[in-house]
């Protein structure tokens, strides 16, 4: 009886030890990989409620992002201070403070690194690692990484209208040359 208890205890101990060691090793690899990323280029699928849109996007850390939605003749630009939606079809530009959007957390690499370093993943399955970030306004942002390549795969959040918004990446390229000019906000008269 005592031998059985010892075997069960040892098995349980080794399981806990190796799971924690494996998790720490994984987090270290993810942190090291993410530290080396300065730019991202990718195609995306964005889903807001039942509405699905496609496009391509460029991110340059910190705080720069431009995404094009070709079918909608629309783009979004974050230039470090402002977040704008450019609707070329209507020749309109809508301005917002970047600080008031969830993108502020996603475009600061240090915030994501801090999240990985100081948090346990929300979920780990065979392909995806999911972390959850809670912003200052209690907005929850789920951030997805590929378990095998450790690439950032996208995020999911709730918008101001209580719609679930998912933004998923594919065809990801890292550390490509991206000129700062693409993040320049146009003037409405130039549309």
What are these regions (language model features)?
Residues 57-105, 165:
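An acidic-aromatic
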Residues 114-191:
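Gly/Pro-enriched, hydrophobic low-complexity segments
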Residues 48-50, 89, 161:
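Solvent-exposed strand-loop boundary residues in beta-sheet-rich modules
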Residues 22-32:
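Cleaved targeting-peptide boundary
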Residues 44, 65-69, 83-86, 131, ...:
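Short hydrophobic/aromatic-rich beta-strand segments that constitute the beta-sheet cores
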Residues 32-52:
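A short, Trp-centered hydrophobic/proline-enriched beta-strand micro-motif
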Residues 4-23:
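Classical Sec-dependent N-terminal signal peptides that target proteins to the secretory pathway
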């Amino acid at each position: 009886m005592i031998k059985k208890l010892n075997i069960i205890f040892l098995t349980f101990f080794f399981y806990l030890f190796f799971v924690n060691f494996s998790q720490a090793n994984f987090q270290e690899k993810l942190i090291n990989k993410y530290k080396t990323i300065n730019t991202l280029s990718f195609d995306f699928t964005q889903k807001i409620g039942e509405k699905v849109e496609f496009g391509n996007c460029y991110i340059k850390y910190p705080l720069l992002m431009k995404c094009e939605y070709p079918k909608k003749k629309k783009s979004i630009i974050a230039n470090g201070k402002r977040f704008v939606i450019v609707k070329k079809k209507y020749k309109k530009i809508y301005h917002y403070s970047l600080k008031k959007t969830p993108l502020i957390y996603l475009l600061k690499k240090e915030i994501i690194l801090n999240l990985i370093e100081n948090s346990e993943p929300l979920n780990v399955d065979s392909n995806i690692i999911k972390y959850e970030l809670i912003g200052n306004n209690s907005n929850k942002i789920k951030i997805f990484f590929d378990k095998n390549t450790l690439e950032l795969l996208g995020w999911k959040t709730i918008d101001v209208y209580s719609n679930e918004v998912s933004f998923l990446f594919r065809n990801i390229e890292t550390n490509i040359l991206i000129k700062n000019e693409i993040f320049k906000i146009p003037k409405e008269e130039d549309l």
